[in-house]
Amino acid sequence: MPYRKVLIIRLSALGDVAMTIPVVYSVCRAYPETTFVMLTQKVASQLFINAPRNLQVVVADVKGRHKGFVGLYHLAREVRRLSIDAVADLHDVLRTKVLRFFFKLWGIRVAVIDKGRKEKQELTSRRAKVLRPLRSSFERYGEVFVSLGFSFVPNFVSLYNEGVGDEGLYSELTLPKSSGERWIGVAPFAKHKGKIYPLDRMEKVVSELSEESRVKIFLFGAGDRERE
């Protein structure tokens, strides 16, 4: 067993935190004797349903009491009291770099994701574009754990394991899914403009999907500005 208690950091955004779940749940189940602590923001903490018993979720209030350098120092101290002996940074932004600084100062082993920023810049460059397959976020998340000594085979199936979700949770929104019907969720907006698919094209995508028989479209993610 490589470590007894591992801190996992992914503060935002919601979709990126959601993408950690298949990897995190798989690692937790592969190493039941290790406790994993997921550090994320409150809104994202609600994603971790039916979690493995050895996964604990801790909320970071980065816009409140954990804001700024001093706030992050207090956050690092709070987490340190949980007897963390290794850190898996799945975010690699300024906030997590500050946290990593404190953990390294205290002699705690740290592993950080390689986001492949250089490769992505080469792929999206207007000139001298380098066309080559890039590793997925799932692969990059997994590599962080492997670097800490956690070898595992991804075995995540669903948040509901082999079953399905409770239809009663959305009974006020729509009728139960009928046999042969396909449900497609579309979240057209993002916090960063560069991550938003052009709205005119997205409208075309939704329009074409809605014309297919036995397809129901669900739109998600609109804030106040988008609703206007």
Give residue spans per PLM region.
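Catalytic machinery of carbohydrate-active enzymes
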Residues: 1-228
